[in-house]
């Protein structure tokens, strides 16, 4: 008798995706982060669902509804902090996943890569809107500052901002629509993830050496399922440790003060995972220029397949490119640190230099290094 998992219409799809999927035998732990992102998304949707059962998207009661969740709901404090810190874990996994794609040349699967960039944008939008919901000081002012960037768009800017706000300032209408969008977007992310996997399984996974591995494939289960379970346990350990021992470590103390339109916080800054982009935005004195730089700092990922000049796919055997890659990672860490600092000397000039270096590395230095490596290898 044929196994049901190979004949049943639904089981057959799952079987081809997670059980009998031919996988390269040499993929390292850097390939674990895709499944970890799936786990993060599941945790976020489940905790978010329970939070939505008790939350009220109204300016007069939003802040107190969060207090009610933390004080009166059974394990509400835990659900709330799992959701907040789960977002941080999500972005850590996301950035490592993108970094691995850059290092090993996975971006040459163009369809998969482009859907991935779209997923990044959607996740960033979801996280931003989620940060507004507690209606604390940083929620309100973060929403005001970031949505106000749309006013830099010539001619239609002001109209667009008022359309997004649903009025003449960030108010009840803004909070209600942000809650609606924050609720629906994760399900759109699930749909996009399915498409992401669909495109990936058209080509099969890349591997650390960046060479075809068709002659050396192993089934996904049990070899990679057990490996993914270990990764999942480690991720949950870190998330639970963070949630139970230092729940507010990555948050902003200002968000424990209810939103007050008459009192501006000393330093308006987004969550830590947006600080690198925020630093790039702030480093340009012109408003429109800053917005374009902010947008391009993420959109640049779409151009990476076009900037690939090396004859080798992976950076595994390219020391010059490796050096520039780690310089880029360091630069992003510097930008993240700068984004959290006040706008004063020496942070302004450091942010400007780090921003210039970021674009230079991706657009000029890395393609040039690849070209030089080709010449050295007489290719």
Swiss-Prot record:
<keyword id="KW-0408">Iron</keyword>
<feature type="transmembrane region" description="Helical">
    <location>
        <begin position="226"/>
        <end position="246"/>
    </location>
</feature>
<dbReference type="GO" id="GO:0005743">
    <property type="term" value="C:mitochondrial inner membrane"/>
</dbReference>
<feature type="binding site" description="axial binding residue">
    <location>
        <position position="182"/>
    </location>
    <ligand>
        <name>heme b b562</name>
    </ligand>
</feature>
<dbReference type="InterPro" id="IPR005797">
    <property type="entry name" value="Cyt_b/b6_N"/>
</dbReference>
<dbReference type="InterPro" id="IPR030689">
    <property type="entry name" value="Cytochrome_b"/>
</dbReference>
<keyword id="KW-0812">Transmembrane</keyword>
<feature type="transmembrane region" description="Helical">
    <location>
        <begin position="77"/>
        <end position="98"/>
    </location>
</feature>
<comment type="subunit">
    <text>The cytochrome bc1 complex contains 11 subunits: 3 respiratory subunits (MT-CYB, CYC1 and UQCRFS1), 2 core proteins (UQCRC1 and UQCRC2) and 6 low-molecular weight proteins (UQCRH/QCR6, UQCRB/QCR7, UQCRQ/QCR8, UQCR10/QCR9, UQCR11/QCR10 and a cleavage product of UQCRFS1). This cytochrome bc1 complex then forms a dimer.</text>
</comment>
<dbReference type="Pfam" id="PF00032">
    <property type="entry name" value="Cytochrom_B_C"/>
</dbReference>
<dbReference type="InterPro" id="IPR005798">
    <property type="entry name" value="Cyt_b/b6_C"/>
</dbReference>
<keyword id="KW-0472">Membrane</keyword>
<dbReference type="GO" id="GO:0008121">
    <property type="term" value="F:ubiquinol-cytochrome-c reductase activity"/>
</dbReference>
<keyword id="KW-0999">Mitochondrion inner membrane</keyword>
<feature type="binding site">
    <location>
        <position position="201"/>
    </location>
    <ligand>
        <name>a ubiquinone</name>
    </ligand>
</feature>
<dbReference type="InterPro" id="IPR016174">
    <property type="entry name" value="Di-haem_cyt_TM"/>
</dbReference>
<comment type="function">
    <text>Component of the ubiquinol-cytochrome c reductase complex (complex III or cytochrome b-c1 complex) that is part of the mitochondrial respiratory chain. The b-c1 complex mediates electron transfer from ubiquinol to cytochrome c. Contributes to the generation of a proton gradient across the mitochondrial membrane that is then used for ATP synthesis.</text>
</comment>
<feature type="transmembrane region" description="Helical">
    <location>
        <begin position="113"/>
        <end position="133"/>
    </location>
</feature>
<keyword id="KW-0830">Ubiquinone</keyword>
<keyword id="KW-0679">Respiratory chain</keyword>
<dbReference type="InterPro" id="IPR048260">
    <property type="entry name" value="Cytochrome_b_C_euk/bac"/>
</dbReference>
<feature type="transmembrane region" description="Helical">
    <location>
        <begin position="33"/>
        <end position="53"/>
    </location>
</feature>
<dbReference type="GO" id="GO:0045275">
    <property type="term" value="C:respiratory chain complex III"/>
</dbReference>
<comment type="similarity">
    <text>Belongs to the cytochrome b family.</text>
</comment>
<feature type="binding site" description="axial binding residue">
    <location>
        <position position="97"/>
    </location>
    <ligand>
        <name>heme b b566</name>
    </ligand>
</feature>
<dbReference type="GO" id="GO:0046872">
    <property type="term" value="F:metal ion binding"/>
</dbReference>
<keyword id="KW-0813">Transport</keyword>
<dbReference type="GO" id="GO:0006122">
    <property type="term" value="P:mitochondrial electron transport, ubiquinol to cytochrome c"/>
</dbReference>
<dbReference type="InterPro" id="IPR027387">
    <property type="entry name" value="Cytb/b6-like_sf"/>
</dbReference>
<feature type="transmembrane region" description="Helical">
    <location>
        <begin position="347"/>
        <end position="367"/>
    </location>
</feature>
<protein>
    <recommendedName>
        <fullName>Cytochrome b</fullName>
    </recommendedName>
</protein>
<keyword id="KW-1133">Transmembrane helix</keyword>
<dbReference type="Pfam" id="PF00033">
    <property type="entry name" value="Cytochrome_B"/>
</dbReference>
<keyword id="KW-0496">Mitochondrion</keyword>
<dbReference type="InterPro" id="IPR048259">
    <property type="entry name" value="Cytochrome_b_N_euk/bac"/>
</dbReference>
<keyword id="KW-0249">Electron transport</keyword>
<keyword id="KW-0349">Heme</keyword>
<feature type="transmembrane region" description="Helical">
    <location>
        <begin position="288"/>
        <end position="308"/>
    </location>
</feature>
<keyword id="KW-0479">Metal-binding</keyword>
<dbReference type="InterPro" id="IPR036150">
    <property type="entry name" value="Cyt_b/b6_C_sf"/>
</dbReference>
<feature type="transmembrane region" description="Helical">
    <location>
        <begin position="320"/>
        <end position="340"/>
    </location>
</feature>
<feature type="transmembrane region" description="Helical">
    <location>
        <begin position="178"/>
        <end position="198"/>
    </location>
</feature>
């Amino acid at each position: 008798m044929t196994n049901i998992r190979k004949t049943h219409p639904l089981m057959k799809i799952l079987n081809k995706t997670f059980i009998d999927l031919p996988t390269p035998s040499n993929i390292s732990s850097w390939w674990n982060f895709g499944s970890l992102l799936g786990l993060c998304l599941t945790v976020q949707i489940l905790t978010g669902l329970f939070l939505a059962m008790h939350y009220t998207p109204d300016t007069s009661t939003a802040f107190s509804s969060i207090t009610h969740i933390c004080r009166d709901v059974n394990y509400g404090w835990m659900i709330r902090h799992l959701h907040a810190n789960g977002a941080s874990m999500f972005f850590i996994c996301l950035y490592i996943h993108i970094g691995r794609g850059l290092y090993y040349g996975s971006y040459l699967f163009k369809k998969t890569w482009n859907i991935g960039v779209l997923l990044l944008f959607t996740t960033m939008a979801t996280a931003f809107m989620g940060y507004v919901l507690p209606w604390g000081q940083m929620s309100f002012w973060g929403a005001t500052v970031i949505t106000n960037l749309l006013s830099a768009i010539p001619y239609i800017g002001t109209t667009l901002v008022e359309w997004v706000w649903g009025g003449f300032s960030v108010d009840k209408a803004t909070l209600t629509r942000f809650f609606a969008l924050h609720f629906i977007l994760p399900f759109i992310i699930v749909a996009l993830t399915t498409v992401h996997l669909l495109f990936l399984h058209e080509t099969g996974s890349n591997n650390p050496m960046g060479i075809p591995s068709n002659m050396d494939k192993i089934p996904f289960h049990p070899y990679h399922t057990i490996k993914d379970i270990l990764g999942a346990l480690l991720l949950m350990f870190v998330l639970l440790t963070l949630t139970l021992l230092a729940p507010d470590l990555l948050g902003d103390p200002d968000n424990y003060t209810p939103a007050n339109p008459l009192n501006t916080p000393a330093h308006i800054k987004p969550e830590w995972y947006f600080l690198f982009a925020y630093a790039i935005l702030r480093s340009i004195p012109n408003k429109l220029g800053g917005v374009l730089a902010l947008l391009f700092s993420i959109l640049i990922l779409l151009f990476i397949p076009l900037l690939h000049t090396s004859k080798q796919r992976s950076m595994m055997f390219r020391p010059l490119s490796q050096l520039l890659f780690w310089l880029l990672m360091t630069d992003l860490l510097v930008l993240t640190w700068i984004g959290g600092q006040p706008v004063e000397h020496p942070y302004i000039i450091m942010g400007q230099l780090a921003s210039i270096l970021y674009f230079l590395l991706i657009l000029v230095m890395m393609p040039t290094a690849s070209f030089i490596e080709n010449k050295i290898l007489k290719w």
